[in-house]
């Protein structure tokens, strides 16, 4: 008998099964197929020819052999191997078809998009050079990356090793795998019970037959009963071992699935998932939460640069007070020191303005001085009024 075809099919099952399933496959090939093909046929080849009965009645010996062995041991075990391996072969065909279909679908998707891109953020160096402030700002912009480069990066990363269970689950074959495992277990139990009712646990050395056309009870003798009994017990042990492996594999799948679900929940609690933002092409921008300060225009240098800067600062302070208001808890402790510093700053500002007008208009210094004096008086009165009201603006 040639077993090469079935052996090649079972080798393909080896590539789509768990660690326990591979052990079961080894037991099936080594102990069942090899023992049945080599040992069984050599032991039972003379089973009917050496079955001798003490009668000369024609046809009585054949009828007694049929009563002794309704089904030959070797044919029973061959039938058992075929039926037990059938669910695995059907699972293999389904798995190959589904995996090929998935690969074909992925190939069509890759062909549909010629050069897909993946977006990643990168810093724009040209923007930094144009600012001329020699400061690193986290200006980011989305950069397109070829999908092939992304796949090469993913392939370079080592994948975690597993025993085949995760691969079966990722391919969507877990349900059909469990179904074929249950069918295989049912066949094992059925053949184990049938073997017990057909042959028992021992091959007796003689058999008493009383069937027609035998004239009376006759004794029939079996060749090599001890050898056949040992081989029968070995096949019982192999069947029981395969049944235990099936139960072990079911427990392995059950506990493994529970462990994976618990680990996934733990990872979700420890590491919150990243947010998936839709792809949009945006102009270079700063990350969220980063305050961008616009660089002010350059002020041409003049003799009144300090005065203009002070005027702009005072204007900004007034605008800030109008927007946010002021609170009494932010007032400085020493108001007299603050007023003294304000008067000194105002005097320096008056001197600078007088010097500027004296250089540009030497004929009318008195009129300008009078205007400046009136202006400074109004400013001092406004300062004193604001200080008395509890405001926190500072004039420079």
Curated annotation (Swiss-Prot):
Taxonomic path: Eukaryota, Metazoa, Chordata, Craniata, Vertebrata
Biased composition (Basic and acidic residues): 147-156
GO BP: any one term: cardiac muscle tissue development
Low complexity compositional bias, start-end: 373-396
Topology, Cytoplasmic side: 1-18, 97-175, 251-396
GO molecular function terms listed in the Swiss-Prot or TrEMBL record: gap junction channel activity; gap junction channel activity involved in AV node cell-bundle of His cell electrical coupling; monoatomic ion channel activity
Region (Disordered): 145-165, 357-396
Residue ranges annotated as Extracellular topological domain: 40-75, 199-229
Coiled coil location: 303-358
Annotated transmembrane regions: 19-39, 76-96, 176-198, 230-250
This protein's UniProt keywords: Cell junction, Cell membrane, Coiled coil, Gap junction, Membrane, Transmembrane, Transmembrane helix
Assembly information from the UniProt record: A connexon is composed of a hexamer of connexins. Interacts with CNST.
Gene for this chain: Gjc1
Main localization of the protein described in the UniProt heading: membrane
Native source organism of the sequence: Rattus norvegicus (Rat)
Family per similarity comment: Belongs to the connexin family. Gamma-type subfamily.
Protein name according to UniProt: Gap junction gamma-1 protein
Membrane topology: Multi-pass membrane protein
Function: One gap junction consists of a cluster of closely packed pairs of transmembrane channels, the connexons, through which materials of low MW diffuse from one cell to a neighboring cell.
């Amino acid at each position: 008998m040639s077993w090469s075809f079935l052996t090649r099919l079972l080798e393909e099952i080896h590539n789509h099964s768990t660690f326990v399933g591979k052990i079961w496959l080894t037991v099936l090939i080594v102990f069942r197929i090899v023992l049945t093909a080599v040992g069984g046929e050599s032991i039972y080849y003379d089973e009917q020819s050496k079955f001798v009965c003490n009668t000369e009645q024609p046809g009585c010996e054949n009828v007694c052999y049929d009563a002794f062995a309704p089904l030959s041991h070797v044919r029973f075990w061959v039938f058992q191997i075929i039926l037990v391996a059938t669910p695995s072969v059907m699972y293999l065909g389904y798995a190959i078809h589904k995996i090929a279909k998935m690969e074909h679908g992925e190939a069509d998707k890759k062909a549909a998009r010629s050069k897909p891109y993946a977006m990643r953020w990168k810093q724009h160096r040209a923007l930094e050079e144009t600012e001329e402030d020699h400061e690193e700002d986290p200006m980011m912009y989305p950069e397109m990356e070829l999908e092939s480069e992304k796949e090469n990066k993913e392939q370079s990363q080592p994948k975690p090793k597993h025993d085949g269970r995760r691969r079966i689950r990722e391919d969507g074959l877990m349900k059909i795998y469990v179904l074929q495992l249950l069918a295989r277990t049912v066949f094992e139990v059925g053949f184990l019970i049938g073997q017990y009712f057909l042959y028992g646990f021992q091959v007796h050395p003689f058999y008493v037959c009383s069937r027609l056309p035998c004239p009376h009870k006759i004794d029939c003798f079996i060749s090599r009963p001890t050898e056949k009994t040992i081989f029968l017990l070995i096949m019982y042990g192999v069947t029981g071992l395969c049944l235990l492996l099936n139960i072990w594999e079911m427990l392995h799948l059950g506990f493994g699935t529970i462990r994976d679900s618990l680990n996934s929940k733990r990872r979700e609690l420890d590491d919150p998932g990243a947010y998936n933002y839709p792809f949009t092409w945006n102009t270079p921008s700063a990350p969220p939460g980063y305050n961008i300060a616009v660089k002010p225009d350059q002020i041409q240098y003049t003799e009144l640069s300090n005065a203009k800067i002070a005027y702009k600062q005072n204007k900004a302070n007034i605008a800030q007070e109008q927007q946010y208001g002021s609170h009494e808890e932010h007032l400085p402790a020493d108001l007299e020191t603050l007023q003294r510093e304000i008067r000194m700053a105002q005097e320096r500002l008056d001197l600078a303005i007088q010097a500027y007008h004296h250089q540009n208009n030497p004929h009318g210094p008195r009129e300008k001085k009078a205007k400046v004096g009136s202006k400074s008086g109004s400013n001092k009165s406004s300062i004193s009024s604001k200080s008395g009201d509890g405001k926190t603006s500072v004039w420079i």
